[in-house]
Amino acid sequence: MNKLKEYFKSYYVLNDVSGLLFWDNATNLPKKSIESRSEQMSILSNFTDRIFRSEDIQEEIQKAENTKLSEADSMSLKLMKSIIVKENAIDPDLKSLLIKKKLTCEHLWREARSKNDSSIIEKDFNDLLDLVHEEASQLAKATNLSPYDSLISKYDMDYDSSKIDKFFSVIEREIIPKYLDIKKIKSPHVYKSNISDSEILKMIKVKLKQLNFDFDRGRIDQSHHPFCGGATNDVRITTRFEDNILESLSALFHETGHGVYEQNRPNEYLYEPLGQSRSLSVHESQSLFFENHIFKSKAYFKIINNIFDNSKDLEKSFLEHYHTVRVNPIRVSADEFSYPIHVYIRYKIEKEIFKNKIKFKDIKNLWNENYLNNLSINLISETEGVLQDIHWYEGIFGYFPTYALGAMIASQIKFNCPLFDIFLGNPNEENINLSLIHI
């Protein structure tokens, strides 16, 4: 197993380098440098590809299969084989084309979103869709799954569309009718802070450090779409500052949940499959735990509001945003009750994309139709509609279900951690820190 572990260490280190290049692309990369960056990431992908296509690694797999292994190594070997199958399933030339088109679309998405004009990205997105369909087809053949299920398996091996359908049937049957029947706030109060973004971030960093985010192994920056990336022991989270400071802080706590999870992976398995996240559903459960059950809790809000001199105005905005069902076209800003409906809509559209290979124009129409039927929202702005999320424009399909599954897991964690309620009843950072130890 030692030689196999060395191969996988190389694989994960190369992924780390790619992760840092991606972070730089999202935060600092000049517009005219996109082509060079896509070449850099494409070459890195080729090096990764060579690792798993070598005859030597196949021989090492066979040796390991004929060796008595520890329980940990047996599980690691199983995961290694799965990764190799998926990596080798995709043609290297297709991987390079995908990387280049993803970077192009990601930058065009920024422009299209800021100008509320999807025509800027429509052609390139349709080209990207063609490449993703080919990726899904190749992956499906290697994994004996449907094309869409093969993409879902990239993010969570424990779920496929049949299981996710059962999960979302509850949303269809129970949540959507109740949402449509509830009298909702249409325009919640928005708190306007007179504190600068940089000063708020400086004070919030103190709170995040108290929640175990290690700034000696991580950092916070700004980007067009909040995310958590970087590398092993170099976790980089981003946020964007909105007119509504609560939305910015909510996103920041969400990404901090991802970051704390990454920083607490077991050191002895950092460069093995066993030391990676269990799944993206579990990863999202950690981010949504931080967002929904810490930041959005009434008890922890008292800690946050100290920064704003215990503002009654901010408290009103907080209660209307996070403790009231309301009409909101934006997924990341949605209240906890309507949030899974937003995810459900994206899942429905993704299924249609891979069933009937619909293009951007039909995707946009389907998006608007579903928002009207399921959320009573008549969309006018494309920025608040099909352009609001970055995922599809980065070629990421099959990921959205992990948000709903993650929210479910986060709620289960909260339900099974009675100490957490006790500690939040006496809201101070030390008590919250203690409760996190028990999760």
Outline where the language-model segments fall:
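Conserved small/polar residues in nucleotide/adenosyl-binding loops
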Residues: 437-439
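Active-site recognition of the HExxH zinc-binding catalytic motif
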Residues: 249-264, 284-288
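C-terminal substrate/ligand-recognition segments
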Residues: 395-412
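Post-HExxH zinc-binding segment in Zn-dependent metallohydrolases
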Residues: 276-314
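Divalent metal-coordination and catalytic microenvironments
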Residues: 4, 140, 254, 287, ...
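Contiguous, non-catalytic segments that form substrate-binding/exosite surfaces or channel walls
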Residues: 98-247
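Long, amphipathic alpha-helical stalk/connector segments used for oligomerization, subunit docking
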Residues: 299-394
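A well-structured
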Residues: 1-157
